[in-house]
Amino acid sequence: MAVKLIVGLGNPGPKYQWTRHNAGFMVLDRLSHLTGITVTRKNFSGLCGEGSWQGDRLILLKPQTFMNLSGRSVAEALRFHKLTVEDLIVIHDDLDIPFGRVKLKAGGGHAGHNGLRSLSQELGSGAFLRVRMGIGRPLHGDVVNYVLSNFSPEEMIGLPRLLDGIVDLLEMLITEGLPKTMSLYNNKELL
């Protein structure tokens, strides 16, 4: 039985609950609901839960450190469970992908994402798997304000279907592996 640490990136607190930057938290909450793995235990500077799904042991983690310090929480969890970056799946928002699309990426840089920057610094490596949920770029205005703003009413309508599609992607990733999942899902419109 393989063990995977699945991390959803976001900011804690009700103020940020429906912001674009909390896409990782939203996916993890949906995964938690569908797998029955509750993410309520306070540990590793975050909220976590453990359970079995599709024959593997999953550790779900929502760092409660705010985005730019997420790496501390993830590093603590990896050390405690004696896991490596190869056992890590990180779900995060991505400005360079349109809303409604998702991409998988193995390794890479942080592309200006403060959560990924923190992870790479704390782990000493960016060689972890990323599930990149598209949020699109603002047509005009500040990127920081955009990622910290709520999804639009139109986006909120499609959000449940998008989150379910990403959970389906995670299920395939766990059962079928990266190459097959990438070929089926990369840049696929999930709405």
Swiss-Prot record:
Q: Which UniProt keywords apply?
A: Cytoplasm, Hydrolase, RNA-binding, tRNA-binding
Quote the Gene3D superfamilies the UniProt record gives.
Answer: Peptidyl-tRNA hydrolase
Q: Where is the active site?
A: 21 (proton acceptor)
Any keyword Nucleotidyltransferase? Answer: no
EC number(s): the record gives 3.1.1.29
Record site: Stabilizes the basic form of H active site to accept a proton:
93
Q: Where in the cell is it found?
A: Cytoplasm
Record site: Discriminates between blocked and unblocked aminoacyl-tRNA? 11
What are the recorded GO MF terms, alphabetically?
peptidyl-tRNA hydrolase activity; tRNA binding
Catalytic activity entry? an N-acyl-L-alpha-aminoacyl-tRNA + H2O = an N-acyl-L-amino acid + a tRNA + H(+)
Instruction: Detail which positions bind tRNA.
Output: 16, 66, 68, 114
What Gene Ontology cellular-component terms does the record carry?
cytoplasm
Q: How does it assemble?
A: Monomer.
Family listed: Belongs to the PTH family.
Protein role:
Hydrolyzes ribosome-free peptidyl-tRNAs (with 1 or more amino acids incorporated), which drop off the ribosome during protein synthesis, or as a result of ribosome stalling.
Which PANTHER family does this chain map to? Answer: PEPTIDYL-TRNA HYDROLASE (PTHR17224:SF1)
Please give the name of this protein: Peptidyl-tRNA hydrolase
Taxonomy-wise, where does this protein's organism fall, top ranks first?
Answer: Bacteria, Pseudomonadati, Thermodesulfobacteriota, Desulfuromonadia, Geobacterales
- Protein encoded by which gene: pth
